[in-house]
Amino acid sequence: YYDVVDQNAKPAIPEWKVYFEGNFWGHSEKERAGTEVPLNQQFEWAGHHWIIPAAYSCSKGFVVDFCMRTPEEDIRRFMTKWDLHSENDSCEYFTQEQQLQIDLENPLCLDFIPRLELNGKTMLTSHGCSVVFNPCLPDGMINEAEAKWALEHYDLDTSYGWMIFRAAFPWTSKRRPEIKSLSLTMEQRPCRVPGPHFQTHAPGDSFSFLHPVSGTNYTLTVQEIEQQTIPQKCFGSDRWVYPTHFTVMRYTLFPESEEDISICDCCDGDKPMEIAVEGDSFTPETQNNACVGIIGGADGPTVIMTGEKSQGRLYAACSALHFEPVRDDVEWCTMFSIKNFDETTINLI
């Protein structure tokens, strides 16, 4: 989001142009800029004030800028809680679960899905990008220039924080249509919320937990636990040696769930080792700037529905990867996919 640079440096402000295939940082020289369509719409949604100042009609589609406003005090409260400063603004200082919680609480971050209804036809996004302006940055850090240019162009109040999301919507017809009516629907993308931790030792062990939204009391019962390995050749790398050992837990849920519930490993797993030349031999050395999320962990796919048993659907959760077989019981974390806000529709034209 932010740059650490000489605060006295002031780059020249370029002419404001928006391109369908471009972003805030550049575009193809072959592409023509879109024609601005003033909208000047404001609304409240998901705990934020939103402004849609303009859209841009391009040869390939429609581009819309979404401006989400956040009060300064909300940002300061968030930064104080997580002790965020110039020396601590990196994911390497936080566990995967803490990173998920930070993303959930970040007042300058909201993952949403916009849909347009143009002349009665639905338009979906093909791609997008965003910039963030934070008025509470500590000394030594400044907002990136592109965020400042966007605020200046749209005359947005710099005493607030802003997330400006640019979404591109391809035309649904071969020709650029005349805009007769235009509406927007905002839908929150489900977010992953970490829940209680647990450990299991053997088949037959069980763990009960409540869904944080529905309040349903679920019981997880272990059916199988086994050690497995991934062949090193599956990673397809001659430069890195990857951990290959992991634990698979197969389990059932009662009652059977129609809600999105997953299980992941609380452990980050072992880091890959880079094969570095030492003398005449290749010696693996651990590197801190690489990570593995192929199997388990909060960022990886962790649950697979594997079939039916007499007890109900059978699921499988995979642990993080390690260089040695996992001897201790894995500490698992429940994970819920949740929407906190209902969708809303706004007439733009």
Feature roles, as predicted:
Residues 1-288, 311-349:
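Alpha-helical, hydrophobic structural elements that either
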Residues 293, 304-306:
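Ligand-binding pocket scaffold of soluble enzyme catalytic domains
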Residues 296-297:
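Short conserved micro-motifs on helix faces and helix-strand junctions that flank
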